[in-house]
């Protein structure tokens, strides 16, 4: 039997498994386990699986996240908010300022607590890079900002960047009118992105407000994407389309993104909530 919790951040839903005291799923079995558990209709169903693990020494606790297809992601904005609430509410680490180890480096999470439970969190998402070799992107250009990419017989103007994981940002007039099921996977799996990429279509309502729809790498269409919201606002600031404080409307709810300057680079804070849905037991061997 495997104990788990089901959580979501703006409808981006996850199975959370506590491995802070002992390993529940062997490393070599994690991808297969994730694919099985995330399959809707046949198991719990989720956009991904989060594992809570002990820190290696640099942080308070370690965050690992796997996409529904079994691939491991570097970072996830909605996922880290769920993770932080789980860690605090279950007294695994009882700090209101968490230093969380991720594959994208240490992320600082500040928790707002009421009646002993986390109600909101603010995450320092760190700085973005537009360097194509760090996204990565298989092109000769140093950066790919507001450039055309041939996709499905049309030229799509996009900006590529990484905020610890890769994102393609496409500014459009009507985000909700985009043919996401056609363009999303075509861009995600484009040969210029050797590690695939998260895809976001962004409509600018005003310099302080956007609407965003997402096709996530390894998960498909999702209700929200925290790193994607962060990347979209940073790209908008870079292109002088947006102010440095932006409300992001997603199918699952809203996030607030505040961009800051760190030397020559742009970073951002992401603020939003996370919800505990239920606890459960998987009646299977790991």
From Swiss-Prot:
Active site: 76 (proton donor), 225 (proton acceptor)
Name listed for the protein in its UniProt record: Diaminopimelate epimerase
Binding site for substrate: 12, 67, 77-78, 165, 198, 216-217, 226-227
Keyword terms: Amino-acid biosynthesis, Cytoplasm, Isomerase, Lysine biosynthesis
NCBIfam families to which the protein is assigned, alphabetical: DapF (TIGR00652)
Function: Catalyzes the stereoinversion of LL-2,6-diaminopimelate (L,L-DAP) to meso-diaminopimelate (meso-DAP), a precursor of L-lysine.
Pfam families: DAP_epimerase
Keyword hit for Hydrolase: no
Organism: Methanothermobacter thermautotrophicus (strain ATCC 29096 / DSM 1053 / JCM 10044 / NBRC 100330 / Delta H)
Pathway the protein acts in: Amino-acid biosynthesis; L-lysine biosynthesis via DAP pathway; DL-2,6-diaminopimelate from LL-2,6-diaminopimelate: step 1/1
Subunit structure: Homodimer.
Subcellular location: Cytoplasm
Residues annotated as site: Could be important to modulate the pK values of the two catalytic cysteine residues: 167, 216
Catalytic activity, reaction form: (2S,6S)-2,6-diaminopimelate = meso-2,6-diaminopimelate
GO annotations of cellular component type: cytosol
Enzyme Commission code(s) on record: 5.1.1.7
Primary location: cytoplasm
GO aspect biological process, one term: lysine biosynthetic process via diaminopimelate
Molecular functions (GO terms): diaminopimelate epimerase activity
Gene: dapF
Native organism taxonomy: Archaea, Methanobacteriati, Methanobacteriota, Methanomada group, Methanobacteria
Similarity comment: family membership: Belongs to the diaminopimelate epimerase family.
Classification via PROSITE patterns: DAP_EPIMERASE
């Amino acid at each position: 039997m495997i104990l788990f919790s089901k959580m979501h951040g703006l409808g981006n839903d996850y199975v959370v498994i506590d491995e802070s005291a002992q390993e529940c799923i062997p490393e070599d079995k994690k991808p297969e386990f994730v694919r099985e558990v995330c399959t809707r209709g046949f198991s719990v169903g989720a956009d991904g699986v989060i594992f809570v693990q002990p820190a290696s020494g640099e942080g308070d606790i370690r965050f690992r996240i796997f996409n529904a297809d079994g691939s491991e992601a570097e970072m996830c904005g909605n996922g880290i908010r769920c993770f932080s609430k789980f860690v605090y509410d279950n007294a695994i680490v009882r700090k209101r300022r968490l230093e969380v180890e991720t594959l994208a480096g240490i992320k600082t999470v500040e928790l707002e607590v009421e009646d002993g439970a986390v109600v909101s969190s603010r995450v320092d998402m760190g700085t973005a890079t537009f360097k194509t070799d760090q996204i990565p992107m298989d092109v000769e250009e140093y950066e790919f900002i507001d450039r055309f990419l041939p996709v499905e017989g049309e030229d799509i103007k996009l900006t590529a960047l990484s905020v610890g994981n890769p994102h393609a940002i496409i500014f459009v007039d009507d985000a909700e009118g985009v043919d996401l099921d056609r363009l999303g996977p075509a861009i995600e799996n484009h040969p210029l992105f050797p590690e695939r990429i998260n895809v976001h279509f962004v409509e600018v309502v005003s310099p302080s407000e956007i609407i965003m729809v997402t096709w996530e790498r390894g998960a498909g269409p999702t209700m929200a994407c925290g790193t994607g919201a962060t990347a979209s606002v940073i790209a908008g600031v870079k292109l002088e389309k947006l102010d440095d404080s932006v409300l992001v409307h997603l199918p699952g709810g809203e996030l607030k993104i505040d961009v800051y300057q760190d030397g020559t680079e742009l970073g951002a804070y992401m603020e939003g909530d996370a919800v505990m849905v239920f606890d459960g037991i998987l009646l299977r061997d790991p």
